[in-house]
Regions:
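N-terminal small/polar loop signature for handling phosphorylated ligands or for N-terminal nucleophile
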Residues: 46-60, 223-264
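N-terminal alpha-helical transmembrane segments of multi-pass membrane transport
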Residues: 2-8, 18, 22-23, 28-53, ...
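Glycine-rich phosphate/nucleotide-binding loop
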Residues: 257-356, 363-367
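N-terminal glycine-rich phosphate/adenylate-binding segment common to multiple enzyme folds
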Residues: 47-164, 271-275
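Glycine-rich phosphate/diphosphate-binding loop of Rossmann-like nucleotide-binding domains
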Residues: 6-25, 154-248
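Internal helix-turn-beta structural module
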Residues: 319-325, 343-406
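Buried hydrophobic positions in well-ordered alpha/beta secondary-structure cores of metabolic enzymes
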Residues: 14-16, 68, 130, 195, ...
Length: 406
């Protein structure tokens, strides 16, 4: 079988631990036999981020901006325990936070549904997509550990050094903590446009939530700018498409989502989207059953698996144990990136392969071959086998080969 040509590269961002192993298996067994894979490779393992003082992450983000498409493996965001484990000189920043700040985009996450695993929320019939603002808030916050009594103030000066606002945050009588975060109008406006444009593409309603009753400037700004963009740029198109936009407090939307049938885009601020995307994934089946794409305002796309490095499987793997790791989200990331590359280049063969790659793993799972995370959630009558990683990848390759020859 002649391999599919891929003249233009994508940025490939390798990662850590078990997902790094799965990453290599997907490339070697599912992609390279069929495609002349063309990537610019960036090693974002925690060891290489340490060796390069995290410069490799900055370079990877720039590559995505230049090439327009990137695909990222799961990476470690170190805490104190990980710092000691990997002998790090500092707690390096989350690679995702660095990349999202550089691209200033919106993260869209949606569950991968299979009939063998029923959602925990029985009324959900269609996937719920989380649209997460990928800039600012606590991910770009400045923090301070207060050790003694004193006064904390919020001070703003203009570019000429003129004081425009000074507010007392709190008079500390003893130890405590401080955090200051920000966002930008232009980033919020881009977030709104990304959400509404995506909704028109996939024909789904948009629900947006904040807590503007409490945060009367910060969250209120999000609410007002979203409404402005909708009214001035999208209301007519939504009406013609039979779609709706609604705003509500986040606690209200959370309650309504649980009672909905799904099939909506839930637009969230950065932290809210971080939390709710995992909740939607777990309630739909499993965290490794979640697609994730970062879309920037200037048309850049970064695809990744919306889960961690599966450290428990990695440690068992290092002991020589056979493990059964769910590869579907990582396969979906590769499939999404290759399809987008094909769409941008007019490469119909690459688009067709990417679509088959995305379906192959799902069809294997639908036949009852399930990874460890899903096996316990499946009706025993429909469960066939829990294959280890090598066997599961072999089954997916067989299915993909059938599709390519069909």
């Amino acid at each position: 079988m002649k391999k599919i040509s891929m003249p233009n590269p994508i940025a490939e961002l390798d990662g850590d631990e078990m997902t790094r192993i799965i990453w290599a298996m997907i490339k070697d067994e599912l992609i390279k036999p069929f495609v002349e894979l063309n990537t610019e490779y960036y090693d974002l393992s925690i060891q290489n981020r340490e060796n390069t003082k995290d410069q490799v992450t900055v370079e990877a983000a720039e590559a995505i901006k230049r090439l327009k498409v990137g695909v990222k493996c799961a990476t470690i965001t170190p805490n104190l325990q990980r710092q000691q484990e990997y002998h790090l000189t500092k707690l390096w920043r989350s690679p995702n936070a660095t990349i999202r700040a550089a691209l200033d985009g919106t993260v869209f996450r949606a569950p991968i549904l299979i009939s063998k695993v029923k959602p925990v929320v029985s009324c959900w019939k269609r996937p719920i997509t989380i649209a997460r603002h990928a800039y600012g808030d606590i991910y770009r916050a400045v923090e301070y550990r207060v050790e003694c009594p004193g006064k904390a103030e919020l001070l703003f000066t203009d570019e000429n050094g003129r004081e425009l606002s000074r507010q007392t945050i709190f008079d500390f009588k003893g130890p405590g903590i401080l955090q200051a975060m920000h966002n930008r109008d232009d980033s919020i406006l881009s977030f709104a446009r990304c959400c509404f444009s995506y909704a028109l593409d996939v024909k789904q309603d948009v629900w947006f939530s904040t807590k503007d009753t409490i945060s009367k400037d910060y969250d209120q700004t999000f609410k007002l700018l979203f409404q402005k963009v909708f009214d001035e740029e999208y209301s007519e198109a939504f009406e013609q498409a039979g779609l709706r936009y609604r705003y509500a407090l986040i606690d209200d939307v959370a309650a309504k989502v649980i009672r909905s049938e799904g099939g909506i885009i839930w637009a969230c601020k950065n932290y809210d989207g971080d939390v709710m995307s995992d909740l939607i994934a777990a309630a739909s089946g499993s965290l490794p059953m979640m697609t994730s794409v970062l879309v920037s305002p200037d048309g850049c796309f970064e695809y990744e698996a919306a889960h961690g490095t599966v450290v428990d499987h990695y440690r068992r793997h290092l002991k020589g144990e056979k493990v059964s790791t769910n590869p579907l989200a990582t396969i979906a990331a590769w499939a999404g990136a290759l399809k987008k590359r094909g769409e941008l280049d007019g490469n119909t063969a690459l688009i067709g392969f990417a679509e088959k790659l995305g379906r192959a793993g799902i069809e294997v799972f639908e036949e009852g071959y399930l990874s460890e995370d899903l096996a316990a959630l499946c009706d025993p009558a429909e469960f066939r086998e829990m294959p280890d990683n090598e066997r599961l990848m072999g089954l997916i390759r067989e299915k993909l080969t059938e599709m390519m020859q069909g």
